[in-house]
Amino acid sequence: MYFELKENKPHGTKDDPFSTYHIKNEGRSFQIPVHWHDELEIIYVKSGFLTVSISGENYIGTPGDAFVVSPGNLHFMGSQTDTVDYFTFLFPLKYISFCINDMLDDKLLEPLKNGHLMISPRVKDTAKELCEQLVEIYMAKNKKTEPQITAQIKTKIILLQFILPHFKNKL
């Protein structure tokens, strides 16, 4: 059953494996079906209320809340209220790897990828600020006001900043 729930939709491209999805739902309730994927996902609630379920734990996201879905974790999201505006950021962990089998890979990225380590789903503190920066990069990419390589460099720096506090706290 678990393998049947794998999301097979490709995320990103070879040149830019980081994906941003902006979901603005108005006027009706909805639910994204339960699924899992190999990428790490950050869910950021911009406005409204979002029900998020990660590995059987249920949360109610309010404006400014962020959630992390580790690779392989079953999750779904939805809303019973009329309006919610949220973003999801998906990326393979190798996107922020320096591809040299260093301590970052050995102690954090590989264990996350293999399911031996998980980031706590509910994220606090600086998450809102970092997610807002990711939203700004997404908007600039859509408007083509920033070179693609610049957007990728900024995105990777922000993602590393996002993960750093969790690594400091031994996840």
Regions from the language model: what does each represent?
Residues 15-17, 39, 63, 83-85, ...:
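A structure-centric signal for secondary-structure junctions around beta-strands
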